[in-house]
Amino acid sequence: MRMPTNLQHPNMTAIASLPRSQNALKIVSPNTFHVDANAPLPTLVDHDSVLIRVVCVAINPVDGKSADLSATAGATSGTDFAGIVVALPPDTNSEPDDDALKIGDRVMGFVFGNNPQGRDNGAFAEYVTVPRRLLWRLPAHMSLETAASLPASLASVGMAMHYLQIPLSSLQSAISKSIASSSAAAAADDEGPFVLVYGGGTSTGCMAIQILRLAGFVPVTCCSSSSAARALSLGAAATFDYASATCGRDVREHTHDSLALAIDCISDSASMSICYEAIGGGGGRYVALDPFPVRGCVRRSVVPDWICTLTQFGRPVAWAPPYNIDERPGDRRFAEEWYRLAQRMLDAHVIRAPTLETRTGGLASVPEGISEVRMGEVKRKKLVYNIVEQKAAA
């Protein structure tokens, strides 16, 4: 078989036929999109790239934020997807590993959409390419809709723990122990170190609470009163209303002035201030999911940092400042190990997905969802779209 020109790779294993073009949601200008019905398929940049036929996609805040702050005209949008493997790197089937990916496998992943250096690749399209070591295979119990809601949060929590300087070896050991205990709830106790998760009602906050419990930490969270019950059910030891004037002080008292680690899933001046107030007198580390306001660095004993999960690919991020980031090979190395560990959690069925709202209309309906998420109109749920439903029904 001859691969389409832009997909050629020596000895690549693929399904019998692939189209020469696809439908893809392209960025036209800041927060303006259109469906290109004749878009090229993504180029296989890495020697270990996998081509996936996308079935479901989910919307993340970064999809609208990046298209607003650093729009790349002609780039495919989207980060979270789930689909079916249709082409593999040449040496995959020769690997002795029984867990090696195979054509037809159901997978999910997080991709660099709106990429100035890879405009043909993004989740909001019929095909996407991702390095094989940065993919998760779906467990039998998981639907493609559910899977599409998980990758960005799962990848971001891992990167946040990496930037908190929690050793990977300790994560592997503790999570293995929790998996052996069947669930985070069965393994949970309140004797480990506290970690504050600010934004426990967000998708990433909910994921962080679960994984921190599995890793032997005691998560406490700042969230709205309407998110508190779910946060507790996911493993939070305590919740604190971020609207309270004493929120930071209350966290500090509850944690006996011992809190040393904080993950800020909101990352604005107010959230940073509360995190800094909550961290104990001995100081600690604060990691935000976005650039933090420098004026918020009011304690020398607290070391601040922020993550851009796109660094997991080991390539530069060429967005507008402050999101112009040189490649970070260490983040790629960590991510590959983290994905292996997270696969074990997925297989063990110890991760709960967010509440989903599955919408119809395919790619053409996605811009409306991006706008709703960007405007803060979507609360405590994830928007998911099945982009092949209309063709499947035809």
UniProtKB/Swiss-Prot annotation:
Its EC number is 1.-.-.-. Pfam families: ADH_N (PF08240), ADH_zinc_N (PF00107). Coiled coil: none annotated. Pathway: Secondary metabolite biosynthesis. SMART domains: PKS_ER. Belongs to the zinc-containing alcohol dehydrogenase family. Trans-enoyl reductase; part of the gene cluster that mediates the biosynthesis of fumosorinone, a 2-pyridone alkaloid that acts as an inhibitor of protein tyrosine phosphatase 1B which is implicated asa negative regulator of insulin receptor signaling and a potential drug target for the treatment of type II diabetes and other associated metabolic syndromes. The polyketide-amino acid backbone of fumosorinone is first assembled by the PKS-NRPS hybrid fumoS. This is Trans-enoyl reductase fumoC. It comes from Cordyceps fumosorosea (strain ARSEF 2679).
